[in-house]
Amino acid sequence: MGKLANISTNLKNSLQSGLHKTGQSLNQAGQSLKAGAKKLILYIPKDYEYDSGRGNGLQDLVKAAEDLGIEVQREERNGIATAQNSLSTIQNILGFSERGVVLSAPQLDKLLQKYKISKAPGSSENVAKNLGNAQTLLSGIQSILGSVMAGMDLDEILKNKGSELDLAKAGLELTNSLIENIANSVQTLDTFSEQISQLGTKLQNVKGLGTLGDKLKNFSGFSKAGLGLEVISGLLSGATAALVLADKNASTDRKVGAGFELANQVVGNITKAVSSYILAQRVAAGLSNTGPVSALIASTVALAISPLAFAGIADKFNNAKALESYAERFKKLGYEGDSLLAEYQRGTGTIDASVTAVNTALAAISGGVSAAAAGSLVGAPIALLVSGITGIISTILQYSKQAMFEHVANKIHDKIVDWEKKHNGKNYFENGYDSRYLADLQDNMRQLQNLNKELQAERVIRITQQQWDNNIGNLAGISRLGEKVMSGKAYADAFEEGKLIKADTFVQLDSATGVINTSKSDNVKTQHILFRTPLLTPGVENRERIQTGKYEYITKLNINRVDSWKITDGATNSTFDLTNVVQRIGIELDHADNVTKTKETKIIANLGDGNDDVFIGSGTTEVDGGNGLDRVHYSRGDYGALTIDATNESVQGSYTVKRFVETGKALHEVTATQSVLVGSREEKIEYRHSNNTQHAGYYTTDTLKSVEEIIGTSRNDIFKGSKFDDAFHGGDGVDNIDGNAGNDRLFGGKGFDIIDGGDGDDFIDGGQGDDILHGGKGNDILCTVKGGNDSISDSGGNDRLSFADSNLKDLTFEKVNHHLMITNVKKEKVTIQNWFREADYAKTVHNYQATADEKIEEIIGRQGERITSKQIDELIEKGKGKIDQSELERIAESSALLKESKFASNSLNKLVSSAGAFASSNDNRVGLGVPTSLYEHTQSVQFVRAA
């Protein structure tokens, strides 16, 4: 009973405003009422015998009629002849005889028999003994007749006939329709009698209208947990149409057609009765009933039927059809959630179609009545009456609609719970993500089979994050199981020789604890760990569903976060691209979803043995390269310029890398909310996902250990080397690179770079752009390529300058002031600063003593041809400031020179060739390629030392 009381209270609250408005209309109708039916006769025809065991107490009706002053007439005793112009008295509850309005006892008895089966308190077995209910029923009919037939003098009408009689007939038929529809909308006799009385009372007295909601509690459907399509057939008297609408195999057109059929069954009688009544009123009042008037009525009805109301319903059925088609694939993969969504769309589409069709028809009736009654004082009361009736029906429908929606949702909920029981408690929604992953694997298999070749790795480990799925979220909201859904799931698979292999024997991926372990190499020499989609931060999700309003719920997301990913590798030569690992968490966002406050997830990578490559992402990263030649790349993504200062490092390969990521967009994990509507119920479910989100800028610091090489960003990087051997690559941007002590390998890349080798035997490649190169002390090798004008200075040592892409004979050497200017065929210049300064001072300054060696001892062309600083000085002197091209051709053709420099040429060519191929702009994720080594480490060291 507690549940019934709650339903009653909810009904009362939801109907209050609608009923109040309806009551106002009905009250206005009541104000115009006069004494209606002069005589009401309870008519029992000849040969009719009612069975008290079969019926529901007709004897009580007879007694009640007598008490109410209603004449009871038996045809065989009184010989009353039924008028020939009767409205089928035997077929309807009410009709006309020559003496007045006839209340048909057989029809009443037949109507009451339907309640025989009810066992509820106040049902047929009890009501048959209750005279009060019979009196309530008959007095209600009297009241309705009084409203519909207000102002009519039945004696005169029956005597004179004509148009007034037609009006009376129409009013009587309307009353019949109202009674029948009320009868079809209830389940017990006491409810039926009370509803009849209620309508009649409200027509005459608006007091107590607010209690109508209490009467609705007697609808048996509301007291059941299972409210669904059966309520439509009971409440709206459309069993056949409801069966069609419930048929999942029925076409959309058939469903929509059934919806209209249902509407006709519900309101068809009222429509016909109202039309007849209004037209009769117009004729009786002497008003026009011609074509223009009919057109007015028709147009008003047409305007009331909006195709937009049905467009959304058609969309539901179309969505259901599309979902069912989509679901077929995932059914084969073990997941039927999309099919459940289609089932929900069909079920709620059925309800929407039915209710919308009925409401549309009711609106059309009201519109037609208002139009037809225009200009008729007689028609005004019935227009208000119909408005009130349709308002009540619409309000009941809307409340019933929510209950029916929930019934469909409950079925979905139960199917999910049953599935989990049958599968040992496995999470249904996790199974959904599993199916999505398998489908993705199938879709991309051809591309994945080429990964080993494209990435030049014996084994490719692919880590895929299945992120939030809207269909899965919708299903969780509909079924009220949002607490069990997850934001996604991460998977690992592997490929060798283009074939998919089982990965869990050598890959450990644990998103809950933040562990990625690829150390079990199984003698594989090279492997590439590819994060194909953004990997969410580690931790365990917990959800709690909270009610925030009458029909509003939110499933809050709480995450027990782990502060870092821990990556462990073994002896294999491995490549890790961490740029798709989400490290930034958007804690606070502004109204435009820009991140204003963040939290960071660190990456700790222990690479073990092997020559490893790591591409750094958006957040703090700690890399321990272990043994082997390891490289750290900052060339993918735009995560701030580097500032590296290793001048005080005491251990080789140790660096602290500071970055400031400027205002812009970066990969963040953010929390979002999906809203799911189940009729009036709104479910909001929080989930997390990755997004390239606008942020206000942030600082981050990386710690590198046992790292042999660092590749910079496309921004303006600063490198300050250690006292050990360093290898730096500036990439794009204006970079400032200082090798400091040690035998360093320094690459500028694109941009206008400033590179200083410092002490030690250094290799310096300015790359493209106008670069400033300084070899410093030691025996340095400087390299220049086309694409810029370089300025070179040197300060001691046995140094060499290589033109990686120019033949020696194609260069022009000339003296410009104190400098040596070398020009290639593209008119790009390399200026060696102060080449002639010491010699010029010696010529002009008495007893000048040379203090510096600022010459490059040897200049080498791309074929290994070379010219020494001594030869340059001699030929410049000979050519009066410029070397003749024939001299350069002679030097290039000197086989003795080429033979002498064979070892140097081969080693340098290999070094220069690999260095010239470097370009950070080509280092993109699309091709899935990894840049080739910029140098052969062992050979380059040997060459520098030998040179």
Swiss-Prot record:
Keyword terms: Calcium, Cytolysis, Host cell membrane, Host membrane, Lipoprotein, Membrane, Repeat, Secreted, Toxin, Transmembrane, Transmembrane helix, Virulence
Keyword Transmembrane among record annotations: yes
GO CC, one annotated term: host cell plasma membrane
GO molecular function annotations of the record: calcium ion binding; channel activity; toxin activity
PROSITE patterns linked to this entry: HEMOLYSIN_CALCIUM
Record-annotated membrane-spanning stretches: 137-157, 226-246, 293-313, 355-375, 377-397
Hemolysin-type calcium-binding repeat ranges per the UniProt record: 711-728, 729-746, 747-764, 765-782, 784-801
Sections of the chain in a coiled coil: none
Membrane topology per record: Multi-pass membrane protein
Chief localization: secreted
Gene3D superfamilies, per database record: Serralysin-like metalloprotease, C-terminal
InterPro entries: Hemolysin-typ_Ca-bd_CS, Hemolysn_Ca-bd, RTX_C, RTX_pore_form, RTX_toxin/Mannuronan_C5-epim, RTX_toxin_determinant-A, Serralysin-like_metalloprot_C
Protein family per UniProt: Belongs to the RTX prokaryotic toxin (TC 1.C.11) family.
Record note on domains: The transmembrane domains are believed to be involved in pore formation in target cells. The Gly-rich region is probably involved in calcium binding, which is required for target cell-binding and cytolytic activity.
Chain's role: Pasteurella leukotoxins are exotoxins that attack host leukocytes and especially polymorphonuclear cells, by causing cell rupture. The leukotoxin binds to the host LFA-1 integrin and induces a signaling cascade leading to many biological effects, including tyrosine phosphorylation of the CD18 tail, elevation of the intracellular Ca(2+) and lysis of the host cell. This leukotoxin kills both BL-3 and pig leukocytes and is not hemolytic.
Protein name: Leukotoxin
Name of the gene this protein is made from: lktA
